[in-house]
Amino acid sequence: MKYTLSVLVEDEAGVLTRIAGLFARRGFNIESLAVGPAEQKGISRITMVVPGDDRTVEQLTKQLYKLVNILKVDNITEIPCVERELILVKINASTSSRPEILSILQVFRAKVVDLSENLLVLELTGDPGKVAAIQQLLQKFGIIEIARTGKIALTRTSKVNTEFLKSISMEI
């Protein structure tokens, strides 16, 4: 199973190195990692996706708290969240394939951010499922390059059913 951890850290040099070192020493893998400033000055939020089981994540959380500059570690895997990723895709786009590509982009609300005679660079922001879906649909055109951010997530404060919201956004 994949787990999403939200970690608040002091914005100090070496924090990410210590976290990566902990993962390496313990033999844990980081599948996805995103780091950026949090709501408070001097604090950063690290969102990471790690494979494992409940026991592994519990052990990892305890180990993270032992590191200097770690303020808070939350396993938000089972908590309703707003999750987003960004993907940039450079694909082959001949004149004949462009209409089909553009119709796919319209369905996903993706944008063309660069183009040349035979290539397009596309941008999409969405939940990880949406990002994976467009990536799969674009395979047949010939993907040249992909740059994909790690997942970022914030827990929902409302009691709104996340699955219900996903179903509504897919209908629109």
UniProtKB/Swiss-Prot annotation:
Task: Spell out the subunit comment.
Answer: Dimer of large and small chains.
From the Swiss-Prot or TrEMBL record, state where the protein is found: Plastid, Chloroplast
Query: Quick one: which gene encodes this?
Result: ilvH
Q: Which UniProt keywords apply?
A: Amino-acid biosynthesis, Branched-chain amino acid biosynthesis, Chloroplast, Plastid, Transferase
Q: One GO CC annotation, please?
A: cytosol
Q: Which domain of life is it from?
A: Eukaryota
Q: Which family does it belong to?
A: Belongs to the acetolactate synthase small subunit family.
Known catalysed reaction(s)? Answer: 2 pyruvate + H(+) = (2S)-2-acetolactate + CO2
List this protein's GO terms for biological process.
isoleucine biosynthetic process; L-valine biosynthetic process
Query: Per the database record, which ranges form the ACT domain?
Result: 4-78
**From what organism does this protein derive?**
Cyanidium caldarium
Which top-level enzyme class is recorded in the Swiss-Prot or TrEMBL entry?
A: transferase
This one is known as Acetolactate synthase small subunit
- What Enzyme Commission number(s) does the record list for this chain? 2.2.1.6
The GO terms describing molecular function are: acetolactate synthase activity; acetolactate synthase regulator activity
Q: In which pathway does it act?
A: Amino-acid biosynthesis; L-isoleucine biosynthesis; L-isoleucine from 2-oxobutanoate: step 1/4; Amino-acid biosynthesis; L-valine biosynthesis; L-valine from pyruvate: step 1/4
